[in-house]
Amino acid sequence: MIRTLLLSALVAGALSCGYPTYEVQHDVSRVVGGQEASPNSWPWQVSLQYLSSGKWHHTCGGSLVANNWVLTAAHCISNSRTYRVLLGRHSLSTSESGSLAVQVSKLVVHEKWNAQKLSNGNDIALVKLASPVALTSKIQTACLPPAGTILPNNYPCYVTGWGRLQTNGATPDVLQQGRLLVVDYATCSSASWWGSSVKTNMVCAGGDGVTSSCNGDSGGPLNCQASNGQWQVHGIVSFGSTLGCNYPRKPSVFTRVSNYIDWINSVIAKN
């Protein structure tokens, strides 16, 4: 019981998490379109990379939720691949001071995830690092919201990642961020938006035809600031429209983290 309570504090609300040392640059317009985040202002953001032909390649984002666990999307994970995690990094091509590359020892995909039925949800996975990392000004853990939290319509959040700058476009070398407004479930699940593809275990944000996540942002965080100034990861980038990354009334869809707090704590406690 004590161990469970300690884990809950660590991944769901410890005061040491969610307060970046380096200030977040507010009101940056878009990930699609290529607006650079302030270096190390999202210190829980990681790059999940796979090995191919002797080289490492960025495939997805993720969030450090404990000193040896990363939260990402289930669709990012393949058991046939070898992965590593880059932490404390702004530029993917530069060996920056204070950054780390850590091997992966375990992959845990949600047991109800079905790659053939993305709209069912449960697009969530945990990646265990081969060794714990020391927390610094450039590498910090994310805070997760209280279980069951539902953000109101038009709540401002930021999506971050190294995904494409536009539909079928180039990928950036440095971390991008984009401000998105939450779209409530009633709106997002309406016929002219996402319809039945969206479930209550998801969060929608964006849909204005300008700002969105894109390919390569998958698994990364939807960062939303609480009234006390603490940043919390409310979403995991899951899917977008095949019509384009920033298609009107097709907001970015995220796994709703607050629906999975018990699952996250359970996986970490058992592993």
From Swiss-Prot:
Residues 1-16 form the signal peptide. Its EC number is 3.4.21.71. The active site is at 75 (charge relay system), 123 (charge relay system), 218 (charge relay system). One of its GO terms (molecular function) is serine hydrolase activity. Its main location: secreted. It is an enzyme of class 3 (hydrolase). It holds the Pfam family Trypsin. Residues 17-30 form a propeptide. It catalyses: Preferential cleavage: Leu-|-Xaa, Met-|-Xaa and Phe-|-Xaa. Hydrolyzes elastin. InterPro entries: Peptidase_S1_Elastase_sf, Peptidase_S1_PA, Peptidase_S1_PA_chymotrypsin, Peptidase_S1A, Trypsin_dom, TRYPSIN_HIS, TRYPSIN_SER. It comes from the Eukaryota. Keywords: Disulfide bond, Hydrolase, Protease, Secreted, Serine protease, Signal, Zymogen. Interacts with CPA1. Interacts with SERPINA1. Elastase that enhances insulin signaling and might have a physiologic role in cellular glucose metabolism. Circulates in plasma and reduces platelet hyperactivation, triggers both insulin secretion and degradation, and increases insulin sensitivity. This is Chymotrypsin-like elastase family member 2A. The gene is Cela2a.
